[in-house]
Structures are given as structure tokens and as C-alpha cells.
């Protein structure tokens, strides 16, 4: 028997700035199924991951919410871990890139690259926010597209015309953080000399480590010539400071992949049988696989292997690249309710439904996967409930009723049993190759054969015939053994169903090798329902809940003014246009005798005078200070008769009340009576 393989597996690190959604889950479920298969085969497979916890976006969100960056990433990590656990994703370790292991490894790798001559420095001119006192990444700059003239476009590309450009080409640039007009400022940046590794990368990307389509795409980039990679960011920045460079921080994409190593190192400290160098050393005989989406191929297939090579570590055995998730043939949409968070799904549906559906659609390629919700319901109900679970539910009752739950060892259909055993190597080969859809097709073809044979034998009819009880037990006994085989084949995909089946079968946790054996003269436990059908109404409820998630997300987080007083219900333009707002000159302002809160304002609105009572006394203890000021006035508000006289309209002010009331005023140049539009 061959030695167990040593395999280290990672999924891309989710960013610690938001919730996990079903698009993310495609990758983690795919990776988890592959790792579970390897463990069932007896291999030493280790699955590590971590939250990607650095960057300006995290720093700015924490600032908005009035908490520290550390508090934010701790809360998000706890949320992520809960979602993954409930989706049955079984990491050996889930860490954070904001860890001492990652700080030490990132600094050590950088210093090795620097000392080997692979780091360069040069001044870079970029936009700087004078209000926030920080340099702005491309996505934190907005302005008018220099190509098509569309306003409110990001600093690197236009969503209207698709053009790409430098931030300095934007017209009327503004900071997306503060709204200030940015200024150009020079700063010293640190660069990784990626071209030093061009020859190695050309060889490695054609070594079989990548799918062919991915290798072809990388060849285009390699043939066009590699550029140095900017690996530094200026303070303020949430991350690790570069050694010997005060105020300079590693760009998030430098320390993020090193987070794979850091998570494994953290695990090694708790599992003495694991040796860090045995998996990461330059001459390591272990296998290393990264499961990633096609949007981050360049980081993992160019920068990452070059960093590892330059720092004296091994390179990945392979990158397993997948496509995006679409829902009902379209990009996930918040407004349609198809941008579904992991937790929203879990609130409505069994995670194994989605695990199976993804498995039934996932192949080796990088094509996008479509979650068609009608097909999802039909496939799960037909395959899992109607085929697999149906075998056990059909047969268990006869064994308990006719033989006290003892499964006999007869084999009334040797050709059928042989077909199941002969299918095992092909199913294993499909799992190994990540051809999950092929594995599921072959498993369901076996389930169809088992169900057809049981229907042909009709134990429910035999049970009514005298002298046929032994045959009933033989048929149902084989049926349960075939069900057990199917459970073994499906266990990497459906671990919860497998655990429930193991309890019913009264067996220890099943391994892949168990498909070679049969249960005989074996006591079963009472049968309990193993899986229920998906109710379409629950899918609809999930979609509606996702729309509610969008509505909740549109409300700002933290303690800002919109949280204290949310935006009112939407109105159409005609309703707004019906309000006649005018510029008014406050000619006279005085106390109102007997009123605790009111001031009387005498207004000039051009060709007319108006008398207004306003509850702003607490903020303006000296009414005469308002005389001569211009303000905004609602001119067509119906007059209101009050104890102290008639109020003819309303002046506009902001603030929560008390001393915090701020009368609104127009810019200089406005004239009494002018309409506000």
C-alpha cells in the first residue's frame, strides 16, 4: 500500500470588510469537498484559511463605525467562521492575516527579497486628500471620465464606457472619502522587481500547475513584459510597517498570500505532528494547492510564486481556478434578491442542498457556474430525496418489521453489486480531478440502477406473499448495502447526511475503502428521515429576505445622523416640485411673550412681507443677531393660526433641537423672493 500523501490546501482569504455570500461559498464548498475526499482516502490533508484583514477600506470602515480596526476585523472574523461552520466547511485552521505569525513571515520574506536585490525604491506622484491627510488609492478617487464625460466614475476605470485610465486623467477629481479636491503629492514607494523572475514564471506557468486556459492568459501578460510591483502604502494604513521604513506599510496583497503560511504555522504550534518546513521548504515533497477565483489569478500565478522563489520557499503544486457564480443566468443582483448572503441562505435552507447543487455543476474548468433556482429545487428533490434517501426509506421498514432490524448478508443481485464496486475508481478519479459534476452523474446513475432493481423486485408486494419473507430480507438487505455505498461516495459532499446515515446504519464513520465491504447479519438502528424536500416557498422567502438585507444595508452603520434620523419615504419629483422654497430676508426677529420656544420673524420675500413663528429660541438667545440674514422659507405652506397670531409659512433649519439648531442660509448674492430650485 502506498504512503499517504501530504497535502496542504487553501482557499482564497475572504476580506474582513463584509459578509460571506453564495458566490464566496462556491469556492469554500468546492475546496472542502476535495479535502474531505482526500481525508476519506487516508491522506494527510490539511485545510487552512484566514481572514484578509488589512487595507485602507477596513481602516476607513472602522473609523466610520467609531471602533478600532482590530475590533472590526475580530467581529467580521467571528461572523465568517460562523457562516463557514454552518455550511459544514471544515477548516483545520482559520486564522487572520493580522497576526504575529504573518507579521514575522511577511517581514522575513521582504528582507530576504531585499537582501537578494529584488526590491527597488523610487518616488511616485499620486493624489493626496488634504482633509484626511492620506494618499488615495484609485478606488477612493471619483470624477468625470476623460473619455465619455460620465460623472462620478472611479479613478481607474469608467463603468459607463469601460475605458481605463490613470487617476490623474480624471476631470474634476474628488476624494471619495471626504469630498475634498485632491492634490498631487510625491512619496517614496517600494517595488518588488517581478521582471527578475520572468524566465522562472514562463516555465512554471507551463509546468502543469495551471489549467490550460489560465496558462494561456498568463502567457499574454508574460509576453507583453512584466512590470515592477508596487508593494508599499503610506500611513495612515492598517497593516504591517515595512522594516527599516517608518511610515511605510506593506500593500495588502503582499501579506495576504503569506497569510496561508501564517495560518499553517499557527496550526503547527498546536499540532506537533505537522512540520512547517516539511510543507513550505524549498525541497518539500508535500503537495500545495490553492483554490482561487479567476479574478485573482495574477496575484497567485505571478507575484506569489516569484515571492516564494526569491525568498527560498517552494512553489504551489497547482492553482485550482474557478469561475464566478451567476443566479438564474444573470449576475447576482441585490435588487432582484439574488445577491444572497450565506447567513440569509442558512436562515431558510439546508446547507447540504447547496453543497450538492454546486457539486453537480462544478467541473475542472474556469467557466462560470449558474445557480438556477428552479433547477436547484428540482435537482435536490429528485436526486437526493427521490433517489438516494428513497432507497433507505423503502427498505428499512421491512428489515425492522420482518427481521427485528437485522440486515442479512444475502446478495441476490451480484451483477448490480459488482457495478457499484467497479464504479468506485472512476468516481474517485473524478473527485481527484475536481470533476465533481462527473462524480455526481456517476453516483446518481448508480442510484437509478438501485431504485430500478428494487422497484422490479417490489418487496412491498413480496411481503404480502406467503413464503417470500427471506427474499424480502435479501432484497432490502442489498438495498441498504447499496445505499451505504452511495453514502460513502457522497460523503465528501454531504457530511451531515452521511453522519445521519452512519447513525442509522450503526457503523463507525465511513472511509472510502469501506465501499469494498458489505454489512452482513448487522443490527440497524431505527430509521429516521434523512432529508426533506425543498419547498419552493422557502426559496422565495430567501429571495425576499435578501431584498430586505439590501434595504437594511442601505442604512448607514455606526452613530451618524442618518442612523439617528433615517431618510424618509421616497417621493416623486412632482411632490417635491409642489413645495415653493424662497429666499427670505429677516427684517426683524423678537421674543414672543408667553412662549418658551418661539421667536417671531418678520420676513421680506421680495414683493411681499410675511410673519412666521419658529421654534428656534433655544439656539438664538439674542434674536436681534438674526436680523439682516437671508434664510430659506417655505412660501406655500398653509397659514397656521396660533395662540400668538398667524404663522405664514416656515423657515428651514437643521439639527436635533435645543441649542443645536442651525438656521439655513444661501450663499451670498441670493436675493429675497428668489425661488430655490
From Swiss-Prot:
GO terms for cellular component: cytosol. PANTHER family: METHIONINE--TRNA LIGASE, METHIONINE--TRNA LIGASE, CYTOPLASMIC. The gene is metG. CDD domains: Anticodon_Ia_Met, MetRS_core, tRNA_bind_EcMetRS_like. Binds 1 zinc ion per subunit. It is found in: Cytoplasm. GO terms for molecular function: ATP binding; metal ion binding; methionine-tRNA ligase activity; tRNA binding. It comes from Pseudomonas aeruginosa (strain ATCC 15692 / DSM 22644 / CIP 104116 / JCM 14847 / LMG 12228 / 1C / PRS 101 / PAO1). Is required not only for elongation of protein synthesis but also for the initiation of all mRNA translation through initiator tRNA(fMet) aminoacylation. This is Methionine--tRNA ligase. A motif ('HIGH' region) lies at residues 14-24. Its EC number is 6.1.1.10. Its cofactor is Zn(2+). NCBIfam families: metG (TIGR00398), metG_C_term (TIGR00399), PRK00133.1 (NF001100). InterPro entries: aa-tRNA-synth_I_CS, Anticodon_Met, Met-tRNA-synth_bsu_C, Met-tRNA_ligase_1, Met-tRNA_synth, Methionyl/Leucyl_tRNA_Synth, MetRS_core, MetRS_Zn. Keywords: Aminoacyl-tRNA synthetase, ATP-binding, Cytoplasm, Ligase, Metal-binding, Nucleotide-binding, Protein biosynthesis, RNA-binding, tRNA-binding, Zinc. Residues 575-677 form the tRNA-binding domain. The keyword ATP-binding applies. It is an enzyme of class 6 (ligase). Homodimer.
Amino acid at each position: 500500500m502506498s504512503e499517504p500523501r501530504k497535502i496542504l490546501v487553501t482557499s482564497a482569504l475572504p476580506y474582513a470588510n463584509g459578509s460571506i455570500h453564495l458566490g464566496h461559498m462556491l469556492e469554500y464548498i468546492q475546496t472542502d469537498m476535495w479535502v474531505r475526499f482526500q481525508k476519506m482516502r487516508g491522506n494527510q490533508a490539511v485545510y487552512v484559511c484566514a481572514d484578509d484583514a488589512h487595507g485602507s477600506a477596513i481602516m476607513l470602515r472602522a473609523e466610520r463605525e467609531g471602533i478600532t480596526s482590530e475590533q472590526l476585523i475580530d467581529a467580521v472574523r467571528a461572523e465568517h467562521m460562523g457562516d463557514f461552520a454552518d455550511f459544514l466547511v471544515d477548516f483545520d485552521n482559520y486564522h487572520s492575516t493580522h497576526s504575529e505569525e504573518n507579521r514575522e513571515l511577511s517581514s522575513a520574506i521582504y528582507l530576504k527579497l531585499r537582501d537578494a536585490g529584488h526590491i527597488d525604491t523610487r518616488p511616485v506622484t499620486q493624489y493626496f486628500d488634504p482633509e484626511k491627510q492620506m494618499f488615495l488609492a484609485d478606488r477612493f478617487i471619483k470624477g468625470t471620465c476623460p473619455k465619455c464625460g460620465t460623472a462620478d466614475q472611479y479613478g481607474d476605470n469608467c463603468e459607463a464606457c469601460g475605458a481605463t485610465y490613470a487617476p490623474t486623467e480624471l476631470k474634476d477629481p474628488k476624494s471619495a472619502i471626504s469630498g475634498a479636491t485632491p492634490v498631487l503629492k510625491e512619496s517614496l514607494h517600494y517595488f518588488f522587481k517581478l521582471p527578475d523572475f520572468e524566465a522562472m514564471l514562463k516555465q512554471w506557468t507551463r509546468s502543469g500547475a495551471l489549467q490550460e486556459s489560465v496558462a494561456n492568459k498568463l502567457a499574454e501578460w508574460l509576453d507583453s513584459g512584466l512590470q515592477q510591483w508596487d508593494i508599499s502604502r503610506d500611513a495612515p494604513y492598517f497593516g504591517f510597517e515595512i522594516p527599516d521604513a517608518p511610515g511605510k506599510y506593506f500593500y495588502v496583497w503582499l501579506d495576504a498570500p503569506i497569510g496561508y503560511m501564517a495560518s499553517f504555522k499557527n496550526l503547527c504550534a498546536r499540532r506537533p505532528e505537522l512540520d512547517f518546513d516539511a510543507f513550505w521548504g524549498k525541497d518539500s515533497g508535500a503537495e500545495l494547492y490553492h483554490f482561487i477565483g479567476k479574478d485573482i489569478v495574477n496575484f497567485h500565478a505571478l507575484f506569489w510564486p516569484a515571492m516564494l522563489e526569491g525568498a527560498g520557499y517552494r512553489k504551489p503544486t497547482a492553482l485550482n481556478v474557478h469561475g464566478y457564480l451567476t443566479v438564474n443566468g444573470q449576475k447576482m443582483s441585490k435588487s432582484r434578491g439574488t445577491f444572497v448572503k450565506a447567513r440569509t441562505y442558512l436562515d431558510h435552507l439546508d446547507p447540504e442542498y447547496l453543497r450538492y447543487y454546486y457539486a453537480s455543476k462544478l467541473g475542472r474548468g474556469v467557466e462560470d457556474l449558474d445557480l438556477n433556482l428552479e433547477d436547484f429545487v428540482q435537482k435536490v428533490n429528485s436526486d437526493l430525496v427521490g433517489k438516494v434517501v428513497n432507497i433507505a426509506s423503502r427498505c428499512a421498514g421491512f428489515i425492522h418489521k420482518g427481521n427485528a432490524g437485522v440486515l442479512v448478508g444475502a446478495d441476490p443481485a451480484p451483477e448490480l453489486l459488482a457495478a457499484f464496486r467497479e464504479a468506485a475508481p472512476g468516481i474517485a478519479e473524478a473527485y481527484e480531478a475536481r470533476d465533481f459534476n462527473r462524480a455526481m452523474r456517476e453516483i446518481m446513475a448508480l442510484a437509478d440502477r438501485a431504485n430500478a432493481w428494487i422497484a422490479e423486485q417490489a418487496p412491498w408486494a413480496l411481503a404480502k406473499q406467503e413464503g417470500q419473507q427471506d427474499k424480502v430480507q435479501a432484497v432490502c438487505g442489498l438495498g441498504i448495502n447499496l445505499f451505504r455505498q452511495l453514502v460513502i461516495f457522497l460523503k465528501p459532499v454531504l457530511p451531515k447526511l452521511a453522519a445521519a446515515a452512519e447513525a442509522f446504519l450503526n457503523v463507525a464513520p465511513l472511509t472510502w475503502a469501506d465501499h469494498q465491504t458489505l454489512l452482513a447479519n448487522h443490527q440497524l438502528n431505527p430509521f429516521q428521515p434523512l432529508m426533506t424536500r425543498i419547498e419552493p416557498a422557502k426559496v422565495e422567502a430567501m429571495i425576499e429576505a435578501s431584498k430586505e438585507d439590501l434595504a437594511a444595508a442601505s442604512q448607514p452603520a455606526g452613530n451618524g445622523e442618518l442612523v439617528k434620523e433615517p431618510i424618509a419615504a421616497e417621493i416623486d419629483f412632482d411632490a417635491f416640485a409642489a413645495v415653493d422654497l424662497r429666499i427670505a430676508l429677516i427684517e426683524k426677529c423678537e421674543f414672543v411673550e408667553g412662549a418658551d420656544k418661539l421667536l417671531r420673524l418678520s420676513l421680506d420675500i421680495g414683493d411681499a412681507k410675511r410673519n412666521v413663528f419658529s421654534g428656534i429660541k433655544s439656539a438664538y438667545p439674542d434674536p436681534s443677531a438674526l436680523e439682516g440674514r437671508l434664510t430659506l422659507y417655505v412660501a406655500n405652506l398653509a397659514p397656521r393660526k396660533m395662540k400668538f397670531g398667524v404663522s405664514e409659512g416656515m423657515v428651514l433649519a437643521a439639527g436635533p433641537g435645543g441649542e443645536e439648531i442651525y438656521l439655513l442660509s444661501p450663499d451670498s448674492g441670493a436675493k429675497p423672493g428668489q425661488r430655490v430650485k
